[in-house]
Amino acid sequence: MARPWTFGIEEEYLLADTTSGQVLASPSPAVTRRCREMLGATFAEEMFLSQIEVVSPVFDSLHQARSFLGENRQRLGEALGDFGVGLYGAASHPCAQWLRQHPRGTAHFRQLFDDYRLVARRSLVNGLHVHVGVPAGTDRMQLINRVLYWLPLFLVLSTSSPLWGGQDTGYMSYRRVICGEWPHMGLPEPLADWHAYQRYRGLLQRTGALAEDGDFWWAIRPSRRFPTVELRICDGCPRLEDGLAIAGLYRHLVQHALARHDGMAVSREIRWITQENYWRAARYGRRGTFIGAVDQQPVSAEGWLAQLQSWLPADSAEAERSFMQARRILREGTSADRQREAYALARENGLAGREALRAVARQVMAEHFPGAGLPQGEIE
C-alpha cells in the first residue's frame, strides 16, 4: 500500500450455524478449506478456530471496494451456505459461550493466549479495521494526533455489540469494554511525534514489556507492515454499506487532516474530551451526548457528525455519499439498535430468551449479503 490515499479494509467474522445461530467452536476442515479456496490471498486466520478475517487488497475508490467486497461476501456466503454455515459479522455474538471456543494453535496465537490468558480467551469479538496510505515522509504520530478527537464518532457509527453471554450488557459496544482488558488497546499514548513513538517503543522492548516484533493494538495506530494509519476502534459492521461509509469518512479525514493544522492538534484538554467521548460512544452509541472540541458544549451524535462535515467539507462524490450514509446510520440505527429490536420482537412473538437470542444471530447473518439496509434504488 505505497500510494497515498489508497486504502484497505479488514473484516472479522465468526462462523455460525445458519439454523441455530450458534457459533461453531470447531468448524469442519471442509468449511475452513472452502473459506481458503474462495478467499485466496484475502483469507487470514484469527484467534479462534471459529473466527476468520478477510483482508482486502488495496483500493483506489469506494466503488472499487464496494464491488470487490460485495462480490466476496456474496460468493463466500453462498458457498458456506452449502454447509449450513453463515458469516456472523457483528462485534459480539448474543449467546456464544467464549469458554467453549478453541484457540487457534499456530505459534503466534499460542503465544498470545499464553501471555494474556483469560483476557485472550474472553476476546471472542469482531472488529472492522481500515488502513489509509499516506505520503512518504509523513509523521504518522502527528497525523494520528490531529484526527484523535474524531475517533469515538467512528465507534458510534459502528456499534454492534450490545449482547454478550446471553445478556444485554447495557452498552452499545461491549467489545470496547473487552478491549479495555488488554494492554495497549485503548487510545494511543500521548506521543508528540514519530521520534517520541520510537523512544516509547524502544523503552518497552528494552525492558521486556514488548517483543521485538510486538505491536500496539491502539484504537488507531501507525501500521508496522505498511505506510498507513490504521483505524481499529470500530465494531464489526454486518452491513457492507455501513463499513464502506466508515472507510470513506476515515479516508477523507486522514487526507484533509494532513493538509491542515488548525484546531485539532492534541492538547491535554482534547485528550480528556476524547477519552470521555470514547466511553460515552461505547455506552450510549448514537443516543449519547458528547463534548464538542471547540466550544466544549454538549452535542448530539448528529450534531457531532455535522461538526465533522463543517471541518471536513465533502468535496467529492465519494465523501458526500459517505456522509449521507453516516447520517442514515444515525437516523435509522446501527447493528446494536437492530439487535435489540430483533430480540424484543422475538420475545413478543413468544420465543424464550435463548431462542430469541438465536433469532438475533440469524438476523445478523442475513445482513452479511450486499444490499442489506439500502433502499432498493440504491442497490448496485
Swiss-Prot record:
Q: Which residues form a coiled coil?
A: none
Q: What is this protein called?
A: Putative glutamate--cysteine ligase 2
As for what it does, the entry says: ATP-dependent carboxylate-amine ligase which exhibits weak glutamate--cysteine ligase activity.
Protein family membership: Belongs to the glutamate--cysteine ligase type 2 family. YbdK subfamily.
* EC identifiers of the protein: 6.3.2.2
Q: Which GO terms describe its molecular function?
A: ATP binding; glutamate-cysteine ligase activity
Q: Which organism is it from?
A: Pseudomonas entomophila (strain L48)
Query: What SUPFAM superfamilies does the entry give?
Result: Glutamine synthetase/guanido kinase
Q: Which reaction does it catalyse?
A: L-cysteine + L-glutamate + ATP = gamma-L-glutamyl-L-cysteine + ADP + phosphate + H(+)
Q: Biological process GO terms, please?
A: modified amino acid biosynthetic process
InterPro entries recorded: GCL_type2/YbdK_subfam (IPR050141), GCS2 (IPR006336), Gln_synth/guanido_kin_cat_dom (IPR014746), YbdK (IPR011793)
UniProt keywords, alphabetically? ATP-binding, Ligase, Nucleotide-binding
